[in-house]
A protein has these predicted regions:
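Conserved ABC ATPase "signature" region
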Residues: 26-44
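Conserved ABC ATPase signature
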Residues: 49-53, 57
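A short, proline-enriched helix->beta-strand linker immediately N-terminal to the Walker B motif
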Residues: 68-72
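A short, surface-exposed alpha-helical micro-motif characterized by mixed small hydrophobic
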Residues: 116-118
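Catalytic Walker B motif of ABC-type/P-loop ATPase nucleotide-binding domains
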Residues: 74-77
Length: 166
């Protein structure tokens, strides 16, 4: 995973702080706890090691570390991969909440149609070493590009009722 297994969650969140900031330990502890709570983890999660966390908690801890330096841009690579549908939906909601409240730009690489529909306001579909289509979910639904059409209007999309939007 994205976390260092030999470090607690709090220590993981502090890694970028130690690397790029010169702050007293007490302040780093406070900032790390703030980020841990910001992503919806309980305060005691800071004392746990990654192996003691559920999949959803691990994803949240990694997100807390990504937010440690208050970035303007966050990159997420398959953030809901390996999560059950309920945890994935909760993570998508968290991403949207953080994006909106912190005015973040979020670049998300995902194959999860639910995540695309819930958390993304613009999408770029990559194929054949280029961007096939770029735009809103509505643009994807109207696209006549064969791969995009199959992906957004195929069987899985119909199960999500995305195809009804076309």
């Amino acid at each position: 995973g994205a976390l260092f297994s030999a470090l607690t969650v709090m220590e993981n969140v502090q890694v970028p702080m130690r690397e790029y900031l010169d702050l007293p330990k007490k302040l780093m502890d406070e900032l790390a706890m703030l980020k841990i709570e910001l992503v919806g983890l309980p305060p005691d999660a800071g004392r746990k090691f990654p192996s003691e966390l559920s999949g959803g908690m691990t994803k949240r801890a990694a997100l807390a570390r990504a937010l440690a330096l208050d970035p303007d841009i966050v990159f997420l690579d398959e953030p809901t991969s390996g999560l059950d549908p309920i945890s994935a939906a909760e993570f998508d909601e968290l991403v949207v909440k953080l994006r909106d409240t912190m005015d973040l730009t979020v670049y998300m690489v995902t194959h999860d149609l639910d995540s695309l529909f819930t958390a993304c306001d613009r999408i770029a579909v990559l194929g054949n070493k280029k961007i096939l289509v770029e735009g809103t979910i509505d643009d994807m639904m109207k696209s006549e590009e064969p791969w995009v059409k199959s992906y957004f209007r195929g069987k899985r999309a119909r199960q999500l009722d995305l195809a009804a939007r076309a």
